[in-house]
């Protein structure tokens, strides 16, 4: 592979343009032993070991994932998040001790994303199986997020469990994975019942 091909590959990653990709490749080439070779090996190992958790749709090297397997977590507290990055934002802050359910996006009429394209089917079954007592809707406060929240609320309404949504700290139109830990912690602490 030539250097320009590697630069082009980095440029495909989010937040990386041609200039930053060139700088990264140059840095890697100058630090082959300390950074480039271990990075290449780590990426290759992870590519073969990472798998989607069959329970929550997290990505981990364990199946079920280390969160779903953790007996110290509260399995009766289920936080439904839009994307994997949202789960990681909660975990980074170490502010939540329940379990998660990653949807893989939000319902969107504009983009043609319906319930069949998201991980929605298994929510009710999971609530029943693990005797979930509270569902926390941890979805961004966008228009699509609000539609998805309403859909999930209607799905679990008949189960008679508490359904809450993150409150203060999330601006209208805001995305969860862009929030700092303090804002996310405040939002989690002040969630409110919607069903």
Curated annotation (Swiss-Prot):
Pfam family for this entry, one: Toprim_4
UniProtKB keywords: DNA damage, DNA recombination, DNA repair, Metal-binding, Zinc, Zinc-finger
Zinc finger C4-type: from-to: 53-68
An example Gene Ontology biological process: DNA recombination
Domain Toprim: 76-171
GO terms assigned for molecular function: DNA binding; zinc ion binding
UniProt key word DNA damage: yes
Keyword presence, Transferase: no
Similarity remark: Belongs to the RecR family.
Function: May play a role in DNA repair. It seems to be involved in an RecBC-independent recombinational process of DNA repair. It may act with RecF and RecO.
UniProt xrefs under PANTHER family: RECOMBINATION PROTEIN RECR
Name of the molecule in the record: Recombination protein RecR
Native source organism of the sequence: Ehrlichia chaffeensis (strain ATCC CRL-10679 / Arkansas)
């Amino acid at each position: 592979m030539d250097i320009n091909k590697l630069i082009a590959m980095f440029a495909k990653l989010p937040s990386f343009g041609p200039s930053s990709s060139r700088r990264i490749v140059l840095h890697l080439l100058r630090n082959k032993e300390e950074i480039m070779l271990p990075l290449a090996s780590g990426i290759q190992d992870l590519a073969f070991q990472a798998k989607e958790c069959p329970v929550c749709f997290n990505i981990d090297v364990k199946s079920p994932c280390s969160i779903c397997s953790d007996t110290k977590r509260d399995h009766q507290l289920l936080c439904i998040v839009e994307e994997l990055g949202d789960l990681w934002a909660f975990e980074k802050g170490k502010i939540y001790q329940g379990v998660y359910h990653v949807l893989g996006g939000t319902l969107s009429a504009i983009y043609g994303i319906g319930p069949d394209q998201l991980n929605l089917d298994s929510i009710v079954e999971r609530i029943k199986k693990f005797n979930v007592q509270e569902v926390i809707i941890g979805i961004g406060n966008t228009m699509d997020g609000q539609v998805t929240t309403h859909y999930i609320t209607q799905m679990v309404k008949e189960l008679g469990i508490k359904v809450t949504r993150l409150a203060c700290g999330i601006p209208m139109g805001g995305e969860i994975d862009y929030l700092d830990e303090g804002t996310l912690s405040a939002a989690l602490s002040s969630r409110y019942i919607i069903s």
